[in-house]
Amino acid sequence: SKAAFLSFWDLKTKETLRIDLWTKDMESDEMKHFFHQTLLSMSDTLERAIGEEKMAGDLRDFCHHFSDKLLK
C-alpha cells in the first residue's frame, strides 16, 4: 500500500486526531484518486453509521464535483 489515513476521535476535546501516511513514490494522480475514494467512502459511512442519507448524498455530489475538477 502506498498511502493510509488513520483517524481517531478524541471525546474529551471533540477533535479528530489524524495520521496521514504515504510513500515517496506515490504519484500525484494516485493521491488524487486516493482522496476521491476516501471521500466517497466517508459518505457511505455517514449514511450507514448515523442514517444521514441527505448529507451523504450531498457529500457524494461534492465528490463528483471534486473528481470533475481534480481527476482529468
Please report, for each region that a protein language model flagged, where it lies by residue:
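Short, charged/polar N-terminal "headpieces" of proteins
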Residues: S1-L6
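C-terminal charged interaction modules
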Residues: D44-K72
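A short, charged
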Residues: F8-E30
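Charged/polar low-complexity intrinsically disordered segments, enriched in acidic residues
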Residues: K24-R48
